[in-house]
Design a protein with these regions (language model features):
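Short beta-strand segments
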Residues: 14, 60-64, 119
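Conserved PLP cofactor-binding pocket of PLP-dependent enzymes
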Residues: 199-203
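Structural motif
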Residues: 11, 58-62, 89, 134-136
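PLP-dependent aminotransferase class I/II
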Residues: 19-21, 114-191, 195-198
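A short helix-loop-beta submotif of the ANL/AMP-binding
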Residues: 27-31
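Active-site pre-lysine segment of PLP-dependent enzymes
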Residues: 25, 42-54, 67-124
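Phosphate-binding glycine-rich loop
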Residues: 1-9
Length: 203
């Protein structure tokens, strides 16, 4: 809502989380759907080409991707930031399962001014029904978000639930480790049956 709107362009890489395109279109933003390779990764040639041809105001990178679980590399995120003149949104709903997180880039002394990282309590915290999430972004973006945020977008119960959940961070990390190990066990077993298993760093 903040960076979309009439006369602007958003880029997604399909297949991916459908709400990026749907919400962008409700603001009359033009949505361009780029593709992925056979392993559902975003390739650097496709990324560069779509940025060059479309000049997007918004570029969405879901990592690990929903619904494929495919992680993107730091190199892909770096390339998106360096080539794009618009805002790069990295959706890390499954970020705690991944080896790389774009949040680390925002901790640098020279953090990217166009990068937004979004996360949710729905996955690793098992709080999907609460509908609670957050973003990590450069300070200049926060007043822009405030311009479009609903006045009652986050009730007190959600805030309390989120604060209580954070007390159990160690337990969450332990659960992530267990789920990741089970994911690998199942992937190995399926590969042993002769099935192709796509690389995943989701749950």
């Amino acid at each position: 809502l903040t960076f979309g709107g009439h006369g602007r362009t958003a880029v997604t890489f399909e297949p991916t989380y459908a709400m990026y395109g749907q919400i962008a279109r409700t603001t009359q933003c033009r949505v361009v759907e780029a593709g992925r390779d056979d392993d559902f990764r975003i390739t650097e040639p496709v990324l560069e080409a779509v940025i060059e041809s479309e000049r997007p105001d918004l570029l969405f990178v879901c990592s690990p991707n929903n619904p494929t679980g495919t992680p993107e590399s730091r190199e892909v995120v770096d390339l998106a930031i360096s080539k794009s003149q618009g805002v790069v949104v990295v959706d890390e709903a499954y970020g705690q399962f991944a080896d790389f997180t774009a949040i680390e880039m925002l901790k640098q002394s020279e953090a990217p001014e166009s990068l937004v990282v979004t996360r949710t309590f729905s996955k690793t915290w098992s709080m999907a029904g609460v509908r609670l999430g957050y973003c990590v972004a450069p300070p200049w973006m926060l007043p822009e978000f405030e311009k479009v945020v609903l006045p009652y977008h986050l009730d007190s119960l959600k805030q309390i639930a989120g604060r209580i959940a954070l007390r159990f961070h160690d337990e969450m990390e332990e659960r992530v480790t267990q789920i990741s190990a089970e994911r690998q066990r199942i992937a190995t077993a399926l590969s042993g049956l002769g099935l192709k298993v796509f690389p995943s760093q989701a749950n």
